[in-house]
Swiss-Prot record:
Subcellular localization, as worded in the UniProt entry: Cytoplasm; Endosome; Mitochondrion
Taxonomic lineage of the native organism: Eukaryota, Metazoa, Chordata, Craniata, Vertebrata
Post-translational modification: Undergoes 'Lys-48'-linked polyubiquitination, leading to its proteasomal degradation in response to signaling by TNFSF13B, TLR4 or through CD40. 'Lys-48'-linked polyubiquitinated form is deubiquitinated by OTUD7B, preventing TRAF3 proteolysis and over-activation of non-canonical NF-kappa-B. Undergoes 'Lys-63'-linked ubiquitination during early stages of virus infection, and 'Lys-48'-linked ubiquitination during later stages. Undergoes both 'Lys-48'-linked and 'Lys-63'-linked ubiquitination in response to TLR3 and TLR4 signaling. 'Lys-63'-linked ubiquitination can be mediated by TRIM35.
MATH domain sequence ranges: 414-559
Gene name, Swiss-Prot/TrEMBL: Traf3
UniProt protein name: TNF receptor-associated factor 3
Chief location bin: cytoplasm
Presence of keyword Zinc-finger: yes
Database matches in SMART domains: MATH
Ranges in coiled-coil conformation: 266-337
EC number: 2.3.2.27
Effect of residue 440 to F: Loss of interaction with MAVS
Entries under CDD domains matching the protein: MATH_TRAF3, RING-HC_TRAF3
InterPro entries the record matches: MATH/TRAF_dom (IPR002083), TNF_rcpt-assoc_TRAF_met (IPR012227), TRAF-like (IPR008974), TRAF1-6_MATH_dom (IPR049342), TRAF3/5_RING (IPR049440), TRAF3_MATH (IPR037304), TRAF3_RING-HC (IPR027128), Znf_RING (IPR001841)
Length: 567
């Protein structure tokens, strides 16, 4: 069987190297359709066990499910891409990890006999499916192949390729009858008409020389007596053309005309010089304007540098403030340590009290008429009373220090509050029962010397939202540096309920303070009247979404500090 050929540099046909195949990740090199099963024409009717349960074509790279049904690899990938894949044959759920390659079935399918794809062009071959690609790539004489010449775009059957390349291809090499050079057949006529140096041509100026080679034409034109020429005063406006003899006669007889042309050209040149001078003046003005702009830019740059230096000094000041706060935290930690020790002592005292109470109980069971027992009981009761008083004092001091430490630990100084509310169900039930209608957050600040604020929430709603919504409010508190801040409060406020799910669909509302509202005046008490949203979010939305996790919700308050001046 004749293989395909290719041309070498001299135009001779050479054996064509074997074409590279696309290996399938299995046995051999086979045709793999992009989607679904094989569409080949099989010699015998294919059994149903070799057909895909989805596309009903012959299986390509068969995969078998746990339920025993087979699918093409691409069809299985399409099924597994759905959220709940099911077998199209029995509707059983498909588990990806339990789908496996059916290599036995694959080998049986590749051994099935098929007709060549070029049967319609005359190929009568019957071969196994696994050998079809090799047959089409290297053997089939009825496979269409591109011409071996790079410029030719025609496709011919493999059996006709040699004749096409040698006899019919428009880009085959042909020999010029004049210069004997090799030229593609499609370009031969153009070569002879315009390019061949050995073709005989005549002078285009119809001089006495009638025949000469195209290669000699250029040299002849430079010497031809009939070659047209122009007057040497052409650049000044003279349009006369003629032979060399006519040009000499013209220049001798037209001296006055040429002088006039020179005068006109000189006048035109003077006008151009004047225009250039005017343009030069305008350019100088533009240069001066640019110089002034550069000076103003330099002044602005110096001003920006000064602002930068001021900002650096502010940053240093803030760093010192931060260091000071860190020192205060360390001091607070030192102050808390004794209270921790007191707490441990209190625990010890509690055990002592319990022991004393046990002793009192024992003594009370003894004969109450015994005088000594009565005195001992009175002494023990007085000791017990003193211990209870000391424990109460310790409890109060520890609670106060714990509260102060929590406030300092959770305070934010950038205008952003993230408030974590635990035990949502219990706290909401207390609100429903009227025990604790609202909760206040820890304070937060717009800066170390800025506004002091907090949030207030009604878990069972307030006003219009009572019993149906969560109500959320913003509160201005009296701060240490209120005297240095601008009033009324004007910063934009954003209230937000945070979504704890992966979609992060937070619920939020924003408002600009009303300068006439008493809620945003300078506080005269501990805090102003709260302002916000009585119907911030419906309780059904809150409790049925992903806003509650581990019986906890998160509320976020953002105060815009971008235009806030330093105190």
């Amino acid at each position: 069987m004749e293989s395909s050929k290719k041309m070498d540099a001299a135009g001779t046909l050479q054996p064509n190297p074997p074409l590279k195949l696309q290996p399938d990740r299995g046995a051999g090199s086979v045709l793999v359709p992009e989607q679904g099963g094989y569409k080949e024409k099989f010699v015998k009717t294919v059994e149903d066990k070799y057909k895909c349960e989805k596309c009903r074509l012959v299986l390509c790279n068969p995969k078998q499910t746990e339920c025993g049904h087979r699918f093409c690899e691409s069809c299985m990938a399409a099924l597994l891409s759905s959220s709940s894949p099911k077998c199209t044959a029995c509707q059983e759920s498909i588990i990806k990890d339990k789908v496996f390659k059916d290599n036995c079935c694959k080998r049986e399918i590749l051994a099935l006999q098929v007709y060549c794809r070029n049967e319609g062009r005359g190929c009568a071959e019957q071969l196994t499916l696994g050998h079809l690609l090799v047959h089409l790539k290297n053997e089939c004489q009825f496979e269409e192949l591109p011409c071996l010449r790079a410029d030719c775009k025609e496709k011919v059957l493999r059996k006709d390729l040699r004749d096409h390349v040698e006899k019919a291809c428009k880009y085959r090499e042909a020999t010029c009858s004049h210069c004997k050079s090799q030229v593609p057949m499609i370009k031969l006529q153009k070569h002879e008409d315009t390019d061949c140096p050995c073709v005989v041509v005549s002078c285009p100026h119809k001089c006495s020389v009638q025949t000469l080679l195209r290669s000699e034409l250029s040299a002849h034109l430079s010497e031809c007596v009939n070659a047209p020429s122009t007057c040497s005063f052409k650049r000044y406006g003279c349009v006369f053309q003629g032979t060399n003899q006519q040009i000499k006669a013209h220049e001798a007889s037209s001296a006055v005309q040429h002088v006039n042309l020179l005068k006109e050209w000189s006048n035109s040149l003077e006008k151009k010089v004047s225009l250039l001078q005017n343009e030069s003046v305008e350019k100088n003005k533009s240069i001066q304007s640019l110089h002034n702009q550069i000076c103003s830019f330099e002044i602005e740059i110096e001003r920006q540098k000064e602002m930068l230096r001021n900002n650096e000094s502010k940053i240093l000041h803030l760093q010192r403030v931060i260091d000071s706060q860190a020192e205060k935290l360390k001091e607070l930690d030192k102050e808390i340590r004794p209270f921790r020790q007191n707490w441990e002592e209190a625990d010890s005292m509690k055990s002592s009290v319990e022991s004393l109470q046990n002793r009192v109980t024992e003594l009370e069971s003894v004969d109450k008429s015994a005088g000594q027992a009565a005195r001992n009981t009175g002494l023990l009761e007085s000791q017990l009373s003193r211990h209870d008083q000391m424990l109460s004092v310790h409890d109060i001091r520890l609670a106060d220090m714990d509260l102060r430490f929590q406030v300092l630990e959770t305070a934010s100084y950038n205008g952003v509050l993230i408030w974590k509310i635990r035990d949502y169900k219990r706290r909401k039930q207390e609100a429903v029962m009227g025990k604790t209608l609202s909760l206040y957050s820890q304070p937060f600040y717009t800066g170390y010397f800025g506004y002091k604020m907090c949030a207030r929430v009604y878990l069972n709603g307030d006003g219009m939202g009572k019993g149906t919504h969560l109500s959320l409010f913003f509160v201005i508190m009296r701060g240490e540096y209120d005297a240095l801040l601008p009033w009324p409060f004007k910063q934009k406020v954003t209230l937000m309920l945070m979504d704890q799910g992966s979609s992060r669909r937070h619920l939020g509302d924003a408002f600009k303070p009303d300068p006439n509202s008493s809620s945003f005046k300078k506080p005269t008490g501990e805090m102003n009247i709260a302002s916000g949203c009585p119907v911030f979010v419906a309780q059904t939305v809150l409790e049925n979404g992903t806003y509650i996790k581990d019986d906890t919700i998160f509320i976020k308050v953002i105060v815009d500090t971008s235009d806030l001046p330093d105190p």
